[in-house]
Swiss-Prot record:
Keywords: DNA-binding, Endoplasmic reticulum, Membrane, Nucleus, Repeat, Transcription, Transcription regulation, Transmembrane, Transmembrane helix. This is Transcription factor MAMYB. The chain crosses the membrane at residues 35-55, 63-83. InterPro entries: Homeodomain-like_sf, SANT/Myb, Zuotin/DnaJC2. Residues 97-113 have a biased composition (Basic and acidic residues). The gene is MAMYB. Residues 56-62 are lumenal. GO terms for biological process: 'de novo' cotranslational protein folding; regulation of translational fidelity; root hair elongation. SMART domains: SANT. Induction: Induced by auxin. GO terms for cellular component: endoplasmic reticulum; endoplasmic reticulum membrane; nucleus; plasma membrane. Residues 123-137 have a biased composition (Polar residues). The keyword Ribonucleoprotein does not apply.
Amino acid sequence: MDFFDEDRPRFVFQSRPSSSHTAEEEEEARIPNKLFISISVSISLIILSLSFFYFESEPAKSLLLWLSLSFLVGPFAPSSLTGGKIRVGYGQILEPEQIHDESSTDNERESRRKSVNKRSKGSTKSDNPPENASAVTEVSRKVVIPQSKESGSVNETKDWTAEEIEILKKQLIKHPAGKPGRWETVASAFGGRYKTENVIKKAKEIGEKKIYESDDYAQFLKNRKASDPRLVDENEENSGAGGDAEGTKEIWSNGEDIALLNALKAFPKEAAMRWEKIAAAVPGKSKAACMKRVTELKKGFRSSKTPAN
């Protein structure tokens, strides 16, 4: 019987040819084939004749000249320029690439494995139901308690008391519209019990119009306006004359003009409900009459200024 040694294989396969074959093939490769040379030269001559006699346009003519030269020079070109042979086992043997930073790659692999393991553990924990329901409820209570404290520290607009509403009204009067940082200062008056958003919502619900109507000074001016006898006499004169409202012209006294100017100084343009306050400060005059009188005074001032210049 014949015994075969498995450690020593009989056939050895080589990816590259032996040195004797390579030397012979290199010599053959250096000598070009006559048939191949004749075919390439004939093709180059045909293309060259076509480029000179049949194609007069410039791009086609230049392309044909380039093709004819390539067919003529191609067989005599070295293999290093034309790419050499593409058969398996020919050419230079490539050296194996050197792997740098092996330690860094190992660390990256370990970190990826750890992250995958953590994700798998987290998914298994979420999938499994809790064993002790009481423990879960206790934990949820512990988590909910600080939230309830925080929510208690900052109340909503529903829990406002009458005293807090009065404080809000006073703060809104103290800090009028247009003042920088108005709502922050108003909210700070409550000692952190309400956020600025809740204060703004509550102020919108109440309405600044009602707040300003509750002012004692405004009420005094309105009562003075209603009880002014000059207003009653003026209405009687207008009704007796029977003229239209557009045709009649209101008469302003010096005291009313002074009161109007003082009101304009007291309530600047940035103040809320400016003209209502000005009309309340001038007895017997409406908002439209005050606005009209201001325009008349401006025109008179400009007309008196032009002749002086």
